[in-house]
Amino acid sequence: MTTGADADARRTYDEERAYVSAVSPTKLVVAKGFVPNMRVPGEIYVNERLRELVLDELRAYCDEDRRGGGYSPAVKQIANVAALPGVVRASIALPDVHSGYGFAIGNVAAFDCGDDDAIVSPGGVGFDINCGVRLLRTNLTEAEVGPVKEALAQSLFDHIPVGVGSRGIIPTSPAALEAALEMGMDWSLREGYAWAEDKEHTEEYGRMLNADPSKVSARAKKRGLPQMGTLGAGNHYAEIQVVDEIYDEFAAKKMGIDRVGQICIMIHSGSRGLGHQVATDSLTAMERAMERDGIEVNDRQLACAKISSQEGQDYLAAMACAANYAWVNRSSMTFLCRQAFAKMFGKPPDELDMHVVYDVSHNIAKFEEHIVDGEMKTLLVHRKGSTRAFPPHHPLIPVDYQYTGQPVLIGGTMGTCSYILTGTEKGMRDTFGSTCHGAGRARSRNKSRHVLQYEDVLAKLKTKGIAIRVASPKLVMEEAPESYKDVTEVVNTCHDAGISKKCVKLRPIAVVKG
């Protein structure tokens, strides 16, 4: 049930703004009272330029005649999450924050498992469960790949099914899907679609152990069965990138990146229709649980259930299956990508040094240990449009990265640069070991379609020397750089705030999109 959702409806922008204060050049704090029932403050990591985007959205909201439909501005959503039962320390927004379903995209919130009332919310994970990014390195250089980038882009386009409704070429029976949902990358390894090292360089080692396929509906499985090893549409892509700058040579070398001009491949995809259906199914069950348990929220999109409830446990088990599916999906596309490169360059993938640098999730909820008010607690950390960024010496990151901190992969927009960051101790203390995940929308998909022409977007990419293959050209306006914030501003804000550290900058030379 909702409560107090419109209690602040009559406030002017100046009245709203009085609750939001800058406490440093990279952080705003949203005080309790901004929305009803806040248990903790909101914290928004933005520099001066990005701050204006957040506040402009709030100003536009205050100037509207009526608030019906659509999403609340991100700052409201951050505050509404701060009112959820069991939330600790703060509801945190990263610099790429923008409004989404329930939680803002770019929101991190943690809930105390020692609190019987603490909740889990599908809106805090999102519909594309374990949407994430994987980076492969190679021993190839731009000088070698540049002359064949058009042919290589076409080869990737031919090997990896892309676009809305795309069907996979990885043979998957219903029994195999059940196994993949339970086993994650262990299934990929068993079936020959992954290398053992791939698993070591994946968040959670590519498998959430609490997965229970019996908690995934038949409809979700039906949607997921034909989509294994497919890229999908929207902001998903496979991109051939060049190392453009190295900021931390020690960390980069640990990742196998040792020179400017080195070729890498970035794959951005998630759990496709299966994950979307898991989220949809859970929302209905949680609305009933809220009525039964008397859980009150400020926004009905924040449907949730107690972590300890049957509905909460069922969602977490199904979400884990969708997360495992996404890791299998990215592993399958890695297999297809390695095939495409091997065919183009006449060498097996291992001779091309096509190793996984790391694979990170952007939409997930996980049980983690964090210090809160001087006490170690087990928390259910929701990351929606944000990335885990654990520091050096953390036990949950691979041996290879114990001295550097976890690699964090930040995808840019179509045609702009991407980054590799590393996790820090300050991030562990301040943001539950989390940082940004990308550029973050500055313009809605609908508005992008109305103000941009797809021919212009494609022409700009070509003038930058970027080979592009797109399954749905008329949708590329939604993903144009003009539709997003500046990813460099986002990354620099996180670096300046100390919650992650810049390591490598990558620029695209070929893009494959749905």
Swiss-Prot record:
Mn(2+) 2 binds at C131, H268, H362. It catalyses: a 3'-end 3'-phospho-ribonucleotide-RNA + a 5'-end dephospho-ribonucleoside-RNA + GTP = a ribonucleotidyl-ribonucleotide-RNA + GMP + diphosphate; a 3'-end 2',3'-cyclophospho-ribonucleotide-RNA + a 5'-end dephospho-ribonucleoside-RNA + GTP + H2O = a ribonucleotidyl-ribonucleotide-RNA + GMP + diphosphate + H(+). The active site is at H437. Its EC number is 6.5.1.8. It holds the Pfam family RtcB. GO terms for biological process: tRNA splicing, via endonucleolytic cleavage and ligation. Keywords: GTP-binding, Ligase, Manganese, Metal-binding, Nucleotide-binding, tRNA processing. It comes from the Eukaryota. Binds 2 manganese ions per subunit. Coiled coil: none annotated. It is an enzyme of class 6 (ligase). GMP binds at residues 235-239, 362-363, 411-414, 418, 437-440, 513. Catalytic subunit of the tRNA-splicing ligase complex that acts by directly joining spliced tRNA halves to mature-sized tRNAs by incorporating the precursor-derived splice junction phosphate into the mature tRNA as a canonical 3',5'-phosphodiester. May act as an RNA ligase with broad substrate specificity, and may function toward other RNAs. Belongs to the RtcB family. Catalytic component of the tRNA-splicing ligase complex. This is RNA-splicing ligase RtcB homolog. It comes from Ostreococcus lucimarinus (strain CCE9901).
